[in-house]
Amino acid sequence: MRTLPTLFAFTFALTLCASAQAPATDSSAPPAAPPRAARPVIATGPIVATVVPPALAGPVTYTCGAAKKGATTLTPATLISGTFAGWDLKTVPTIANGICSATGSDKPFFFSIPVPPGNYRVTLALGGKEASTITVRAEARRLILENLAIKSGASVTKTFDINVRIPEFTKPDGTQGRVRLKQREIGNLDWDAKLTLEFNGTNPAFRTLTIEPLVGAKSEPTLYLAGDSTMVDQDVEPWASWGQQLPRFFLPGIVVANHAESGESAISFLGEQRFAEIISIIKPGDYFFVQFAHNDQKVANGMPRYIQIMTDFVTQVRAKGATPIIVTAQNRDSFDADGHINDTLAGYPQASRQIATDTNTGLIDLNAMSKTMFEAMGKDGANHAFMKFKAGSYPGVERDIADSTHFNNFGAYELAQCITHGIRADKLPIEKFLDPAVRDFDPAKPDVFADFHLPYTPPQKQEDTTQIPQADLK
C-alpha cells in the first residue's frame, strides 16, 4: 500500500514501539532493547517539499459511468495523475450500469483525490447489482465502514469525515515547520496530500462519491491522537492498532487525525516536531488523546522527563481551548503462572494516572481495561489478539511471528472498543460523537475471535512482502 524501499517495507511496519515480551520473573524491568538495525530511522538526504494540490472550491461529485449534471464521470481510464483524482494503487474496478464494482473478486480497489491538508466529508452511495458486504477504509487502512451488508440492487448512502495531513506546517511565528519523518513514512498514504479510499469486502461497489472540504462554517471538531505503534495507522497487514480502528466508532461531526507513529516516546514525539504540528492547528472544541509508555520505559532515568513532557502537552492543548485526555498504555501479552497479566511497563501507566489527577485531565485507563480483557481471553485466547502467526499466514511472513506487544485487526478492534467503553464510563465530553448504534463494550466479556472478520488489505507491490527478520520480533 505504500511506495517504500524494500529494506523498510515490513521491518518498519512494526518498528518495535517496544520489544515483545518482558521476562515474567521481573515484571518491573523494561524489556530488552531491539536490535540496533530494527530501530526507527529518520529520513536523510534532501528534503523534498510536499506538492500541495489546489483547494476544492466546494463539494465535488464523481459518478460511475452514467453522466450526471455537475458530476465528473468515472471510467476505467480515470487514473490518479497529478492533481486529477482517479483509481489508485494499480487497481481499476469494473464500471457498468452506473456502478463501480469489484464483483466476483476478493481484491479491493482504491480511489484517490489530491487535496490540501484539512478535514473532508465523504458521502458514498454504496451497493451494486450483486449483494454486497462492504468495508471502507481511508488513507493507511483507517477503518471507516465495517462489513456493511447491502441487498442485491439496493443502494445505501453513508457519510463520514476524513483528515488529510502533510509534514509541513506553519509555526505560531509564521515560519515553516516540518515533521521529521522516519524512512518508513516516506510515501505513506497518511502523508501524501491526497485522500485515498479503499473499497473492500464481498462485491464492493459504489454509485456516486462526493467529497466536501470542512472549512469555515462547516468546520467541525478534530480528535488528535498522539502515541506509538500501538496507536499508529499501521499500513501493512497483518499489523493493526486501536488508533486506526477508532474512526469506525464515531459519527460524522468529528474527524480523527491520527498523528501516532511507530517507535515514538513522549521525548521523540516532541523532538521530531510531531506535537508542534498538532499544536499549530488544534483549535477550541478539538480533542487530544495522548498515550506513551512502551518506549519511554527504555530511556534511562526517563520518568521525570516523561512526566514533564506529558504535563506540558496537557497544558499547551488546554491553552488552545481543546480538551486533552490521557490514555494509559495497554498491557503486553505476558501472563504469570496463575493466568494474570504481568506488569511490564515499569510504572508508566500509574504515572499517567497521576498526571491526569494532578492536572484535572480526563483519563481512559486502557491499561486496566486491557488487563481485564486479556485475562478474560486467557493466555491462549489472547494470542489471537497479538501478532502471533505461523510462517506463510500472510504474504511476506516467511517465519513464525511471536510478537507480544503489537496487535492484529482483532486485537486492535477489541482495544478500540475498550476506548469507547472508557469514554462512556467516565462520561467524557467526546461521548456525544460516538455512534449510538455501537454497543457498550465490556472488557470482561471480549468478542470471540472466530466470529471476527475484517477483509484483508493486500500489499500493493513486492516491496511490501519482504521477509521479516525474526530478530525484530523477539
Regions found by a protein language model. Give the residues of each.
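Bacterial N-terminal signal peptides
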Residues: 6-16
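Structural motif
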Residues: 265-274
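Compositionally biased, intrinsically disordered or flexible polar/acidic segments
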Residues: 22-237, 397
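Short catalytic helix/loop segments, enriched in acidic residues and glycine
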Residues: 87, 239-252
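Alpha-helical cap/lid subdomain in secreted, periplasmic
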Residues: 139, 273-436, 440, 444, ...
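Positively charged n-region of N-terminal signal peptides that target proteins for export
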Residues: 1-5
